């Protein structure tokens, strides 16, 4: 059917664009030091692997970090500093690009602040959460040595503040990479949202609940990409706390609507009382996203997956029984099950 075919198409579209990682050269930091003296930044973008030096519960740079004791990264640590010393050819203008830390970031190059996303502080009252893409300007100077310090604060939830993937090259190359990624994100997110509007119109005219589920799934898959949802869709002065709650809610709801769609595609697959109980439990879980403090919201998405597992196994058993009873496996079934196999 057209429903099964489009389900498979947008799943393939999502996989196609979400797996476009780019063509990068690898460069590994050792003990917080990156040797880039042999790099040709004019022709390549370098993906920085390895470890930066981490200083737990220290917001400083230069001599302050020299006097501090490095430590191991722990997600329970609410704030800290990452330091990377770059050795490159002298007198080069470079750009370090990457997404900001969860959930506020301040960057210093050779002790001078070059950008701050949100507000970094040693307490929740002193901090303001915000995320964005970072473009960090670097000049290697006479000796080719640069110190980059990324300070973060995370009083939003008990996980986060981990080192993000960084890329180093000329400003032109980093800008080209970012534009390419934005294009993938906009095409994928925009296409899924358009699919969602299409299915919503279909639901209005056809009066079938499965099209409502398809519309919601398309929107959830499109908006769960933070690059599309936060950086391109929301206005610059958005309320961060509300946006964060909706982001976690969209991740939480995804397995629910995928399973509700599956049971709606096959008539009488699940008993109505089972579907109602599952829907009520998930409605309570969804409401909790706007009741609990932000520190307790992130685990709700995992709870949603645990809550969905019994219903998923129930539907698998019912599908096996159905196909065994009718002894027929049609082309529509192949498309639907292939789409779900790719999603899971």
Where are these regions (language model features)?
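Cytosolic-side membrane-insertion boundary helix
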Residues: 159-205
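Sequence/structural signature of beta-propeller blade repeats across diverse families
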Residues: 19-30, 63-74, 117-125, 204-207, ...
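Extended carbohydrate-recognition surfaces in non-catalytic/accessory domains of CAZymes
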Residues: 1-90
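Aromatic-lined ligand-binding clefts that engage carbohydrates, nucleic acids, or primary amines
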Residues: 86-110, 148-150
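Surface-exposed coil/turn segments at beta-strand junctions on protein surfaces, enriched
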Residues: 75-77, 89-91, 129, 140-143
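Beta-strand-rich ligand-recognition modules
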Residues: 28-34, 109-147, 152-163
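Juxtamembrane segments at transmembrane-helix boundaries
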Residues: 186-344
């Amino acid at each position: 059917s057209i429903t099964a075919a489009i389900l498979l198409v947008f799943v393939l579209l999502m996989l196609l664009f979400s797996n476009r990682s780019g063509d990068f050269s690898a460069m590994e930091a050792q003990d917080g030091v990156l040797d880039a003296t042999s790099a040709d930044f004019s022709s390549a973008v370098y993906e920085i692997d390895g470890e930066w030096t981490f200083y737990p519960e220290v917001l400083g740079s230069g001599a302050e970090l020299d006097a501090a004791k490095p430590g191991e990264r722990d997600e329970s640590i609410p704030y800290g500093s990452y330091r990377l010393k770059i050795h490159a050819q002298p007198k080069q203008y470079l750009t370090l690009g990457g997404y900001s830390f969860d959930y506020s970031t301040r960057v210093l190059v050779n002790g001078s602040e070059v950008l701050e996303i949100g507000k970094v502080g040693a307490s929740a009252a002193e901090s303001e959460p915000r995320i964005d893409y970072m473009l960090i300007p670097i000049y290697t100077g006479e000796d080719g040595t640069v110190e980059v310090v990324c300070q973060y604060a995370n009083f939003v939830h008990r996980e986060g503040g981990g080192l993000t993937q960084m890329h180093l090259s000329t400003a032109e190359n980093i800008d080209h990479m970012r534009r390419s990624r934005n294009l993938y994100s906009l095409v994928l997110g925009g296409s899924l949202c358009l699919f969602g509007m299409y299915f919503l119109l279909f639901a209005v005219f056809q009066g079938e609940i499965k099209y409502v589920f398809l519309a919601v799934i398309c929107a959830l898959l499109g908006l769960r990409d933070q690059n599309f949802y936060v950086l391109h869709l929301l206005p610059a002065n958005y309320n961060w706390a509300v946006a964060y709650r909706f982001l976690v809610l969209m991740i939480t709801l995804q397995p629910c609507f995928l399973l509700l769609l599956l049971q709606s595609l096959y008539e009488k697959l699940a008993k109505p009382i089972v579907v109602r109980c599952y829907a009520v439990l998930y409605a309570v879980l969804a409401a909790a996203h706007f009741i609990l403090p932000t520190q307790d919201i992130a685990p709700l998405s995992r709870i949603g997956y645990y809550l969905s597992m019994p219903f998923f196994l129930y539907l698998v058993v019912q599908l096996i029984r159905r196909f065994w009873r009718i002894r027929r496996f049609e082309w529509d079934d192949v498309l639907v099950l292939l789409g779900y196999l790719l999603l899971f």
